A protein has these predicted regions:
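Generic structural detector for well-ordered beta-strands
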Residues: 14-16, 30, 103
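Active-site donor-binding loop signature of nucleotide-sugar glycosyltransferases
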Residues: 15-17, 33, 62
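Exported/periplasmic cell-wall-interacting domains
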Residues: 23-28, 35-106
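Glycine-rich catalytic cores of cysteine/serine-nucleophile enzymes that process amide/ester linkages
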Residues: 2-26
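Hydrophobic residues embedded in beta-strands of well-ordered beta-sheets
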Residues: 1-2, 59
Length: 106
């Protein structure tokens, strides 16, 4: 994941996206909801710290499965390390959801 602020590079972090049989939606989005701690209603109350929801139930969020970052293992969300998820969450809070664009490409 590449993160830019006002057009300047801010960070590059490894992520996990959808595994076979699932999909991470591609496109440009604006976050519509933030949750410091969310629990999945679909996947056994799985913790989703620092969730940034961008389309339906899809979110960018932290994961405890750090060893799997860089691999396609999620149900469609974009997973980050907890520290990076927190940094991104705080950045979106400070910049404002309305000033944040999420672009997901293949």
């Amino acid at each position: 994941m590449s993160v830019a602020v006002d057009g300047a590079d801010f960070a590059t972090w490894p992520v996990s996206t959808a595994r076979r049989g699932y999909r991470t939606p591609v496109g440009r989005y604006r976050p519509y909801s933030l949750a410091a701690m969310h629990y999945s209603s679909l996947y056994d109350d799985a913790p989703m710290p620092y969730s940034i929801f961008f389309r339906g139930g899809y979110a960018i969020h932290g994961t405890t499965e750090i060893r799997n970052l860089g691999r396609a293992v999620s149900h469609g969300c974009v997973r980050l390390s907890p520290d990076n998820a927190r940094s991104l969450f705080e950045l979106v809070q400070s910049q404002g959801r309305q000033n944040t664009t999420i672009e997901i490409v293949r």
